[in-house]
Design a protein with these regions (language model features):
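Mid-length scaffold segments of soluble, non-membrane domains
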Residues: 1-84
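A structured, mid-to-C-terminal "fold-capping" secondary-structure block
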Residues: 61, 66-165
Length: 165
């Protein structure tokens, strides 16, 4: 929950760019409620008490919203299946992420303050995200005759559905 709350700028901005103004407003509300009453985002009070759902959008989906095709499928080490559009989208999300060292370097107590701190925070985030999905990968492996094309197709279909929503 903490990391989900922390990545509010990515979801908020991409909802705005996709002209999903209601979703943007709900993301802003979720961020404020979870930051104030959810102890800095450790608890998801907006979902448990107010039934406000998260609207996860990223820059890859935003590019898809504006008609950019998925192009070449790629498998990224540790990150799994992706495509050229979503890899470009990672750059946009990286710029918006509060865990990056980009932006105003005159902020005295900015975290992360250097690349080492950024790498450590991203590692914790990625490990946490992966630990929440261990069972999904094992169940997919059981259902696949050939894992690579199966994962590629599952990813492509899931992204297409996310962009259409």
């Amino acid at each position: 929950n903490f990391f989900h709350n922390l990545f509010f700028p990515i979801r908020f901005t991409n909802n705005l760019l996709q002209l999903k103004f209601q979703n943007s407003a709900e993301e802003l509300g979720r961020f404020l409620v979870n930051t104030i009453w959810g102890i800095g985002g450790l608890m998801d009070v907006a979902k448990s008490e107010l039934q406000w759902q998260a609207h996860s959008e990223d820059f890859g989906q935003t590019l898809g919203f504006y008609g950019v095709g998925d192009a070449i499928p790629v498998v990224l080490p540790l990150l799994g299946p992706s495509n050229l559009r979503d890899i470009v989208g990672l750059g946009g999300d990286y710029y918006l992420s509060p865990l990056t060292t980009m932006g105003d370097n005159s902020i005295k107590y900015k975290i992360p303050n250097n690349l080492r701190e950024e790498f450590a925070l991203e590692t914790v985030y990625t490990t946490n995200k992966a630990s929440l999905r261990l069972g999904q990968y094992e169940s997919l492996k059981k259902d696949a005759l050939d894992l690579y094309p199966f994962l590629r197709d599952v990813y492509a279909q899931a992204r297409k559905k996310q962009i259409e929503e």
